Amino acid sequence: MIRKYWWLVVFAVFVFLFDTLLMQWIELLATETDKCRNMNSVNPLKLVNCDELNFQDRM
């Protein structure tokens, strides 16, 4: 049976690897800027840009 459907196994592995790489690429594009947690805010779970926090610390 494996001899008959080897191409299907190869295709499934290829699709799995392609999907994994695609999701990693999308995640990399979506998070261009570094995100940090502002522990001094009302909602510390909300992610904000780290540059904004650094700017507030300087003032």
Curated annotation (Swiss-Prot):
The keyword Metal-binding does not apply. It comes from the Bacteria. It is found in: Cell inner membrane. It is a single-pass membrane protein. The keyword Secreted does not apply. It holds the Pfam family DUF2556. InterPro entries: DUF2556. The chain crosses the membrane at residues 6-26. Keywords: Cell inner membrane, Cell membrane, Membrane, Transmembrane, Transmembrane helix. One of its GO terms (cellular component) is plasma membrane. Coiled coil: none annotated. This is Inner membrane protein YhdU. It comes from Escherichia coli (strain K12). The gene is yhdU.
